[in-house]
Amino acid sequence: MTDDEAVTAADSLARLLRETAAELDARHARDEALATVKASRKLLLVHTSASMQPAGRAWRLGVLLLDRDGRAWATGSITRATEPKREQNLSASVEERRDARRAASRRFTEGEVVNFGHVPLPLDAESLRSGAADPLLLRDGVVHVRWGQGADELRELRAYLADRSEFV
C-alpha cells in the first residue's frame, strides 16, 4: 500500500466518523458516559478508594466508542452507576465490578451507563497501516474493524457502523 492510499484511507475514515457522529446526534441517539479511573491510594493509615472522573460522552457502537467530534476509542469496561446494596464477599471479579459500580455512583447519575478503561484510537495513516489502531485496520485501501477474536470476524467499517448505529 502506498503512502497516498493510506492517507486517503485515513481522510475517508475521519470523514466517516464525523458523518456517523452527526447522524447519531441528529437522531438524538442515546449516548453513554465516559470516565477515567483514578486508582485507589494508600498513604500511611489512610486508604482512598478508586474513583471515576467524567471524561465526556460517546455512543457505544460494538467494539468502538464514538464521540460527537468524531473521535474514536476501543471499548474497555462498562458499568452502571448504582450504589451496591450489600457486600457479598464473592469472587475477586464480582467484588471488582461492585467497586466499579460504587465508584461510578459517586460521580454519575443513578442508573447511568459508564464506560471506562477505553483506549483512544490513533486515526492517522501510519497507525492504520501498521496496525496500531487496533481494532481498526487497513485492507486493500479500505478501513475494516475487527469485531471479534476470530480471523473471519473482520468487517468493512462503513457497513459495521451502519449496522451498529441502528441499535443506538
Q: Where do the PLM segments sit?
A:
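Generic serine detector
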Residues: 12, 40, 49-51, 77, ...
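Generic alpha-helical propensity signal that fires on short helical segments
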Residues: 31, 35, 42, 82-84, ...
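N-terminal domain-onset segments
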Residues: 1-54
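Residues in flexible loops and secondary-structure boundaries
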Residues: 32, 80, 129-131
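Aromatic- and glycine-enriched beta-alpha-beta binding-site module
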Residues: 52-104
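Low-complexity intrinsically disordered segments
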Residues: 3-18, 23, 106-168
